[in-house]
Amino acid sequence: MGASAIGATIYYGSQNCRRQIMEISDAFQQAHELGMATVLWCYLRNPEFKKDGTDYHASADLTGQANHLGVTIEADIVKQKQATNNGGYTAIGFGKTHPLVYEKLAPDNPIELTRWQVVNCYMGRAGLINSGGASGDNDLAQAVTTAVINKRAGGMGLISGRKSFQKPMKDGVTLLNAIQDVF
């Protein structure tokens, strides 16, 4: 086929998560043996990640853990939603943590929350690409903001297919050029 990379998705927290981790880990190991790169979409999927009206599917600590697991199974690049909040560990009672982690290491700032995601990719050894999100009304500004946050946090870029390809060609190209200008 001539492929130079493979990609896969793991839905951490889903019923199939353990199987996905094992199968994709094997596939990534084989890909590396063949000299191929690996890309992993690390997404959280569990209704328990919503507590008291807050959705922790994009929580820096939970997505960071997903990123860490993804890099551990040999993902070269991790695609993840950009963190929008934090405190998922304490809210859902998952794992152990300390209040100073949230107060000192990852204050409530989008760059710091995304940096936490990068740190969990072995300090950027595996690249973090944030998703661009769904297409909407203010896509150009949102894409540039997401790109700036990703870059300042130490990420490698973003994937913005829906924002760019669900538009007229001229608008999509303008959006992609704006993202390229950031990087």
For the regions a language model picked out, list residue spans one by one.
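Glycine-rich beta-strand-to-loop/alpha-helix junction loops that act as flexible
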Residues: 129-134, 160-163
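Alpha/beta enzyme core
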Residues: 1-128, 137, 141-156, 181
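C-terminal helical cap(s) of enzyme catalytic domains, especially alpha/beta-barrels
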Residues: 153-154, 165-183
